[in-house]
Structures are given as structure tokens and as C-alpha cells.
Amino acid sequence: MKKKELSIFDKDILKEASINSIKKLNPVELLRNPVMLSVEIGSTITTFDFFYDLATNNNHAWFSANVSLWLWLTVLFSNFAESIAESRGKARAKSLREAKSNLFAKKLKNKNDKTYEKIPASSLQKGDLFLLEKDDIIPIDGELIEGVLLVNESAVTGESAPVIRESGTDKSSVTAGTKVVSGSAVAVASVNPGETFIDKMISLVEGAKRRKTPNEIALEILIISLTIVFLVVVINFRALSYYSVYSTNKGSVVSLVVLVALFVCLAPTTIAALLPAIGIAGMDRLFKKNIIALSGRAIEAAGDANVLFLDKTGTITYGDRQAYKLIPVEGVSEEELAMVAHMASIGDTTAEGKSIYAFTKAKYNLSIDLKDYKVIEFDASTRISGVDTKNEHYRKGSSDAIEKYVSSFGGSIPKNLDKIVEEVAKEGGTPLVVAKDNRIYGVVYLKDIIKPGIKKKFRELRRAGIKTVMITGDNPLTAATIAAEAGVDDFLAQAKPEDKLRHIKKYQEEGYMVAMTGDGTNDAPALAQADVAVAMNSGTQAAKDAANIIDLDNDPSKLIEVVGIGKEILITRGAITTFSIANDISKYFVIVPAAVSKSYPELNILNILHLANPYIAILSAVIFNAIVIPMLIPLALKGVKYRPMDAQTLLVRNLSIYGIGGILFPFFGIWIVYWICEIFWRVL
């Protein structure tokens, strides 16, 4: 179960965004967006010009009125784009607030005395102890120091299946607003009121603490610089117009309204209008995937990451060893081994035991109905499990444990057993030896199954220039086998925390951007060093503090998804910027010939659309410049889909679509608007 999708066309969101877009007309609000502030100033100038034309009975008052209207709409559409992104965030924040409202805590004086004082959750401070029991709503983020809980985290993650939280493990962290399904535990508050994970999520999705990323700042500097350049051009254009008219005694001075229209159409208003929405929508897109980015820098770094450190278990493999093959010893048939392995796994509740039972039943058509038997559960000291019937003893376990067991009954060890065990281990499997009474029958090859499609995914990442490194505690032989089968570029075997840290530093020194996942306290140093650090929400507080991205689903494979979303955000920003700047070329060929047609009729050669009425031509460009903003809002919010490919191919593809398309589309759009306006004016 995932979070409820919020439609772009949700009635409540559209209503709130419309109201906020009007409120944002306040010049103080627009100081954050200098380009749109300059458009608002231009709108004010043309509005005053309209009233002046009315007062002086100027025949072109209709032109001033329409240009003013569409310039104001340009600012409103820009505000609407940002407001709709913010409103989606506020809607999500509202549901999060409901998860933490009216919470109480059972405060303890010490963990040995379970007598508690019931206080408001807001009174708990970092370091305070509190009791958690069945049906309690967890009042504050904390770490279990005693006990085990089954917790429903759907209020935060959207996942209805409860999860286990246990003290002394890497899954000891509990989150405010989640509910205890069963169990009892003592926890220590790991944060102060207002600093909980839900509080951070609320701030982030509302955009209250969203800082501009380095790429956003660089892009803002670019579009502000372009705006200043075009402003200087327009001012000089006015001076040139004066000089031309008075020196040649022909034509007329370009009006203030035309100059403002020229400035607004040439300035990069499209990207300036949509840039805030792209940033906010990026956070929202991650949130829909149950991923919380604690900073905008983390998202950008994810988009630039070119080395992924991936945990083998959970990311590349399922983590549950499953029966893959039966290998009998000399003198034993495969069917005989299957029968003994099947019997030894009856009643076994472990994942491996269930796998062997299902495998032998399906492949060898075994179905045995035992009534009088005793299950011998796995014991860490003996490393053996099995079944005892009235007359027979079936066992399975590690090779040395089974050899010892068989020898105790006076049995012998098959000559080729060691070779079979060694070959299975070399291939990355786990050899489980099977015996009946004093005889060894063979080996069950247990394999940590590689997730389907993972090799294709790694191949796509490689094509996009991203290197994958598998992290595992397995021995080098096993690690090499799994790495080859999965298709990763490199692996780190028998990895200790200090090994991870050393390898991350090594790649960073070579100029790579490194991304990794982790959930334990021992992962914290490496997470802190990585450029993109994804911590599991179930992990320890130390791991979450060191990370800059939190995965609420506790799925290590999400790292690949995080990188993909990061690239989508960067590509979206680049695509709309390219489209916006390319638009200026088309609008130049419409407005400039129209503006100087009387003074310089020779420049009509630039009027490639052959628009006869210069006033309607300029108005058409202004209208198109305004309506393209709401047309691109869905793209800004949903993003340009990322397809794994090398940087050169991606650049050529996006330049073709958004560069060439950005030049051609306005010609077509302005031409359509022109003829609609022409027909409308003829009817009037």
C-alpha cells in the first residue's frame, strides 16, 4: 500500500493554488523571483499606459489593454505553478500532522521501574525514558533499549503490514505517530519535541525548509543575467528608435507597451516561472515513493551519482537461501537423496527448511503423511535440524556437524563429500549435508537467489555511465561468483565498516560521486562520507543522522530508484531551460519585425510567418508567452522520464526534443493565436 496519489487537477488543490497565486502578486513575495518581479513591473507600466491612452482617446488603447491583461496573466500563471506544487505538499503535510496530533507518553524514571507518569508527548525531552505497550501511539522518535515490538508504521510509510522493532539490533528505531500492535518495550527519546522525523517530513513537503540547490542557484544567476541583458537591449532599442525617427523623419518611435512586450517575451520567463515548482515537485516525487530527501543537495547529488555501493542482501539477492539443486554422494541416487532431504525438512519453519520441503515435493513428486514424528529444531550449538520417526533419524546441517553426527553412529564419510561441499561454496552457494541415521546421502545446494531483472538494470546503469559495487560479508570466492552472475562492475568481499569508508574515499579521490545505503550504527561513518547516503527508516538513529535521504520502506534496492529520480529532476530542469531559451529565438522573429516595421520596412524579411498586422503579431507573442507556462506545469510536476543512456546520447536527444522543438513549437503556436485574434477582431 502506497500513499494516496494527489492529482494535479484535484479540486481543493486547484482552489487553494488559485487563491495563493493572487496573494503572491505582492511585490515582496516576488522578490524571490526577480524575473517575474520585472514582469510585474512591466505589467504595471503597461496598465498605466492603458489608462493614459483611454484618457487621451488613443486608438491603440485596445492594444495596451490586451497586452496588460496577458502580462498580468503571465505573472499569475507563474504564481499558480509554484502554488500548485506547494498546495500538494501542504495536503501531504496535513495527513502527517493528523498522525502526531494529541499524543501522550508514558514517562519512566528508570527502565527497571515500570511505574509511569502520563504526560503530553510535547513534554518529552531527548534522553527521557518512556514505556510502550500494545495499542500505544509512539509519542516521539526513539531507540528501544529493552523489549520487542510489532509496530504498524502505515501512518508514516503507507505500508499496512506491521514490522518488528527489537532492542540491541539494527532495527531498534521507532518513529513518532506509529502504532504498537503487540509487545512491550522501554525506549529512550532520541530527539526533542519539534525535531521528530514526522516534523522534518512536514517541513520538507511544505517547502518551509527547502533551500535552493547549487544547480538552482547557478540557473537563477543565468536567467537573471539574461534578463538584465535583455533589459539593457530594450532600453537601447528605445534610444535607437528615437534617433532613427528624428534623423530620417519616417516611422514612429516604438511605444512603451511594445518595448515591455518585447522585454517580457525575450526574457526567460518560462523557466523563471517553473523553476520553483520543479524544485518543490522533486521533493514531492520522492515522497510519493516513500523516500524523504533531507536536503536539496542530496537530490542533486543523486542525479550526479556515478558509483553505487549496493548491499548484496536485499538489493541484489532476496536474502533468503533457497533450495537450488540436490547433489548425491557416490552410491546414492538423486531420488533417494530427495526423499531423505524431504523427510529431514518436515515441520521445519525456517526459510531454508520450507524451501527444501517445497523443492523436493514439487520436483520429485513427494508427498509423505507422517503422523508419529518429532521435529528436531535447529540449534546454533549443534548446527543441525531434522526429524525423528519411530525407527529412523533424519538430519541436515553443516558438513562438519553432520560428519560428526554420522561418526557418532559409527558411520563413514563419503570420499567425494568434501569436493561437493567445496564446489558449492565456490559457486556462491551454501552446502547443506543430509543424512539418515549413520549414512550421508548428499548435499542440498542452497542458493541466495538473485532478483530477476537485476542484471538488466545493472546493464542499463552501465550504459548511463554508472558503476556498481556490491558490498557483502561473503568470502571473496562466493562474492566473485555472485558478482559475475548479477553483472556488477566490482565487489567488496568480507566488508567491514572501515573497508566501506576506505573504498568510498578512494572513489571520491578519483572524482566519482558515490551513493550508498545503510541501516546500522557501524554504517554511519561511511554514510556520512558518501555524497548520497540512503538510510533505512528502521535503522539506528546514528545511521539516520549520518544520512541525507531516508527510505520509509526499508528497501536497500531503492538506491537505484533514488538515483533515477535525481536524474529526472536534473533533466527536467535542463529540458525546460532549453525549451525556454529556444522559445526566445522564435519570438524574436515575430516581435522585432513587428516593432520596427514602420521605421525599417526592410526588416520585414525577418517576418517569416508573414503576419500582416504588427499589433496582433506582438499580442500573439505575448499571449503565447503566457499560456505556455500552464501548458508546461504538468511536465514540471511529473518530470521528464529518465531513460538510461550515455551523456552524449541524452544531450543530443534532449536538444532535439526541447531545443529544436522549442524553436519550432512557438512559430506554430503564435501563428494559431494570431489567426484566432485576427478572426476575433474582424467579428468585432
Swiss-Prot record:
It is found in: Cell inner membrane. The keyword Ion transport applies. ATP binds at residues 348, 352, 378-385, 396. Its EC number is 7.2.2.6. GO terms for molecular function: ATP binding; ATP hydrolysis activity; magnesium ion binding; P-type potassium transmembrane transporter activity. InterPro entries: ATPase_P-typ_cyto_dom_N (IPR023299), ATPase_P-typ_P_site (IPR018303), ATPase_P-typ_TM_dom_sf (IPR023298), ATPase_P-typ_transduc_dom_A_sf (IPR008250), HAD-like_sf (IPR036412), HAD_sf (IPR023214), P-type_ATPase_bsu_IA (IPR006391), P_typ_ATPase (IPR001757). Keywords: ATP-binding, Cell inner membrane, Cell membrane, Ion transport, Magnesium, Membrane, Metal-binding, Nucleotide-binding, Phosphoprotein, Potassium, Potassium transport, Translocase, Transmembrane, Transmembrane helix, Transport. It is an enzyme of class 7 (translocase). The chain crosses the membrane at residues 61-81, 217-237, 256-276, 616-636, 657-677. It catalyses: K(+)(out) + ATP + H2O = K(+)(in) + ADP + phosphate + H(+). The keyword Cell inner membrane applies. GO terms for cellular component: plasma membrane. HAMAP family: KdpB. Part of the high-affinity ATP-driven potassium transport (or Kdp) system, which catalyzes the hydrolysis of ATP coupled with the electrogenic transport of potassium into the cytoplasm. This subunit is responsible for energy coupling to the transport system and for the release of the potassium ions to the cytoplasm. Belongs to the cation transport ATPase (P-type) (TC 3.A.3) family. Type IA subfamily. The system is composed of three essential subunits: KdpA, KdpB and KdpC. This is Potassium-transporting ATPase ATP-binding subunit. It comes from Hydrogenobaculum sp. (strain Y04AAS1). The lineage of its organism: Bacteria, Pseudomonadati, Aquificota, Aquificia, Aquificales.
